[in-house]
Design a protein with these regions (language model features):
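Polytopic alpha-helical membrane proteins, predominantly small-molecule transporters/carriers
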Residues: 1-343
Length: 343
C-alpha cells in the first residue's frame, strides 16, 4: 500500500508540472525572457528553499546541511547549471513541436539518461559506493520500456507531421518544425537528465535519521535548482539587454496579474520534485523504485503533457490511426511505472 501511495504522490506532482504552462498563457505584455526568469524565481529559488527547510530539524540551522559536503554541494550545483541549459532548450522544443510532442521527446530522453547517468558518474567519483549495483535488471527494463513508450509517441508525432498540411500544422503549433524541434528536444533531454545526476551527488546532504525520509531529497533539489537559476538568469538577462525588454519589469498595469501567474506556474513546476521527494519517502522498501523514481516521474510527465496536448487541440486534424498510436504510447508509459514491481 505504501508503494502505491508513493507512486500516486509522484503522479500528482507530474500532473501539476504538466499543467504549469497553462498559467503562463495568462501572462500579459511581457517578453519570454522576462516571464521565464520571474517564474523561475518562484520555481527555482523561493519554493525549493522553503522545501529544503523542511529537512532541517528543530535546533539546527539551514547552513549546517552543507557542513562537510563541499565537493557534493559543488557537483550538485554544477549539474544544476547543466540542467539549466536543458531547461532553456526545453522551452524551444515545445515552441517547434508543441506541449505534447516537445515534452514527450525531451522528457523521455531525460528519463532514460537521467536514471543511468547518476549511478555511472557516482561510480567514477565514489567507487566505494558501488552505485552501479543500483542499475539492476528491473531498473534497466523499466528505462527501456519507458523509452519504448516515448518512441511510440515520437512515431505518432512523425505521423502527425506527415499527414497535416502546413496550414493545419501552424494552426495547432504556430512554429511547428519537426526536424528542428526533434534535434532541440533530444539536446534538452540530455541536459535535463543532469537534474537527477545532481540529486545523486547530493543524496547525502541532510541530517540523517533526524530528517524524515520524505524530505531527504529536498536540500539537493534546492541546490540543483539554484544552479539552474544561475544559467537561466544569465541567458534571460542577456536577452533583456539584447531585446531592450528591461522595461517589462516596470509595467505596473500588468504587474499583479503577471506575478500571480508566474508564481502559480512556478508552484506547479516545483510540485513535481516536491512530490518526488515525498513519494520516495514511501518507496524506501523498494530499492528498484527508489532508483527508477526519476524515470517514473518523467514518464508520468509525458503522459499528462499529452493529455494537455489533446485538451489544447494540438492533435486536431490527425487521423484516428495517429491518435491510436499516441494512446498506445501513453499506455506503455503508464505500464512502465508499475512494471519493476512485477519483475
Amino acid at each position: 500500500m505504501e508503494i502505491l501511495i508513493g507512486l500516486l504522490i509522484i503522479a500528482v506532482g507530474a500532473f501539476c508540472q504538466s499543467s504549469c504552462y497553462v498559467p503562463i498563457n495568462k501572462i500579459k505584455d511581457w517578453s519570454w525572457e522576462s516571464y521565464w526568469i520571474v517564474q523561475g524565481v518562484f520555481a527555482w529559488l523561493i519554493l525549493p528553499f522553503i522545501g529544503a527547510m523542511l529537512a532541517v530539524p528543530s535546533g539546527h540551522s539551514f547552513f549546517e546541511l552543507f557542513d562537510g559536503y563541499g565537493f557534493e554541494v559543488m557537483m550538485t550545483m554544477l549539474f544544476g547549471m547543466l540542467w539549466g541549459v536543458g531547461g532553456l532548450t526545453f522551452g524551444l522544443s515545445m515552441r517547434y513541436l508543441g506541449v505534447a510532442l516537445g515534452q514527450s521527446i525531451a522528457l523521455g530522453t531525460c528519463a532514460g539518461l537521467g536514471t543511468i547517468m547518476g549511478p555511472v558518474l557516482l561510480n567514477i567519483f565514489f567507487p566505494k559506493m558501488d552505485a552501479l549495483s543500483s542499475l539492476t535488471f528491473s531498473v534497466i527494463l523499466g528505462v527501456v520500456v519507458t523509452l519504448l513508450g516515448i518512441a511510440i509517441i515520437g512515431v505518432a508525432g512523425s505521423m502527425k507531421a506527415s499527414s497535416l498540411s502546413e496550414e493545419e500544422k501552424k494552426a495547432a503549433v504556430k512554429d511547428f518544425n519537426f526536424p528542428k524541434g526533434l534535434t532541440i528536444a533530444l539536446l534538452a533531454g540530455f541536459m535535463s537528465g543532469c537534474f537527477n545526476v545532481g540529486l545523486a551527488f547530493g543524496s547525502d546532504i541532510h541530517f540523517g535519521t533526524f530528517t524524515p525520509d520524505m524530505y531527504k531529497t529536498l536540500p539537493a533539489t534546492f541546490l540543483v535548482t539554484v544552479g539552474g537559476f544561475i544559467t537561466n538568469a544569465i541567458y534571460c538577462f542577456y536577452q533583456n539587454s539584447k531585446n531592450h525588454t528591461w522595461g517589462d519589469y516596470l509595467k505596473r498595469e500588468v504587474w499583479n496579474n503577471n506575478i500571480l501567474f508566474c508564481a502559480l506556474a512556478g508552484a506547479l513546476w516545483y510540485s513535481q520534485f516536491f512530490g518526488l521527494s515525498l513519494g520516495k519517502g514511501f518507496l524506501t522498501e523498494s530499492p528498484t523504485l527508489m532508483t527508477l523514481s526519476f524515470c517514473i516521474l518523467m514518464a508520468l510527465n509525458v503522459v499528462f503533457s499529452n493529455v494537455w496536448g489533446i485538451i489544447l487541440k494540438e492533435w486536431k486534424g490527425c487521423s484516428s490511426k495517429t491518435i491510436a498510436v499516441l494512446i498506445l504510447g501513453i499506455v506503455v508509459l503508464i505500464f512502465s511505472s508499475f512494471l519493476p514491481q512485477w519483475v
